[in-house]
Amino acid sequence: MPHVARHLRVAVPQPVAIGTPGPNWPWVWSVQSWLPGDPLTFATEAIARDLGAFLRELWATPTADWPEAGAHSFHRGGRLQVYDDQTRSAVQTVGGHIDQAMAIWTAALAAQAPTAPVWVHGDLAAGNLLLNEGRLSAVIDWGLCAVSDPACDLVPAWTIFDASARSVFRDSVEADPKLWMRARGWALWKSLIVLATREEGSQVTGARRTLDALMSDDALH
């Protein structure tokens, strides 16, 4: 991450040690530096602006020879079509706003990426955003980062922010309609697969809240 860190104002973890695959863990692993801060538990318009500024800096970072999204990053930022069958199945399993959910998904698939791939974090969950005195100070857990479509990094618009902060966030990242539509597809996919495979818990509560936000969003109108 040193290459990325040089281009960001917020802190990101740095590798302390790199491990190799073994019989008990068949993947490369790492130990990262610890960063101070409190995980995000509330969202404000100021945080929406902070996160937008972070993403603009991240997307402007030279991509060098970093690999594009694929199986190694669970296709975060890759083509939404990879999850087409899974999403359509989840829509039927979850039920409810089937027609509206399918309209969001179909529109997202049709909104092809118009720009070159950029750096993406891939997992901007609330727990990966650290605050200091109410402002974004660090972004952690870069295990899914890749060079790909930035739409997947806009998912916090619905998973974290309310309608007012969502509007601020969209303005901050200067998202065009197609980018925003693809982002809605990523948020829909994530919420549906949680609701289709789990019955209770904090993730289910969050997924329901995300789905409600997507259904009430007027981006399709």
For each feature predicted by the language model, list its residue ranges.
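Active-site acidic catalytic loop and adjacent metal/ATP-binding pocket
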Residues: P15, W105-L154
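Helix-rich C-terminal or lid/interface subdomains of diverse kinases
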Residues: L144-V147, C152-H221
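Hydrophobic packing residues in well-ordered alpha-helices of helical domains and bundles
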Residues: I47-L51, L80, A101, V204-A207
